[in-house]
C-alpha cells in the first residue's frame, strides 16, 4: 500500500536544506522548503500499480487509441487493459536489450528514444539506436518502431524512417505550442535554447532526464551537492521547489 509519510521519513534533512539554499541563493525566499512533506508524492503514487490503474480507468473513459509505458516493461495487466479497450500499448525504451524485452512482453509499438530526447532518456544517440533496435528485434516479430529523441522537422523524420523506423514520436516540441500548459516564460526559454543548452541530469526525478541547463541543474552538479536520491524520493525533493520557481517565473521573477 502506498504510504507517502513513510517516503518522507526516508529523505534526509540535508536535501531539504540544499533545495532551500539553492533557491535562496537566487533571490527566492522559501523557508517552508526546509520541511520535508508529502508534496511531490503524487508522482510516486502514480508509479504504483494502484495509482496507475486509477489513471488508466479515467483514460479509458475517453476514446483513446494508444497508451505508452516508460521506465520498464509494462505489467501484464496493463497490456491486457489495452487489449480489452481496443487500445494499442506502446513502450518507451533506450537500448536494444530493452526493445527485445518489450517485444517479448507483447507491446504493440516500440518508441525508441535516443539520448537527444527531452525527459527520461538513455545514453545512446538516436542515429545509432534506431538501426540497432531495428536489427535486434527481427527474430522476435514485426513490431513497428517510432523514432524519438531530437526529432522535430520533416527531414529528421525522413532520416529516422530511412534507418528502419515506421514513423516518429515527437515530445518536447509540443510543449511549446499554444495548447501546452507550460508557462509562457518557460516556452520562450525552450524555443530560445540551442543544442548545447540541455543536460542529462538526475536532479529532478533521480533518473537521468534531459532538461534545460538551469541554476537548479548546475547546483546539483557541484562537488558540494548531495547525490540525487533514487526515484521516487528525488521528485519529492525537487517538485515543490521547481513548482515554486515556475510560479514565480510566471509572475515575472527573473
PLM regions and their residue ranges:
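Active-site entrance/lid segments in N-terminal catalytic domains of soluble metabolic enzymes
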Residues: 1-140
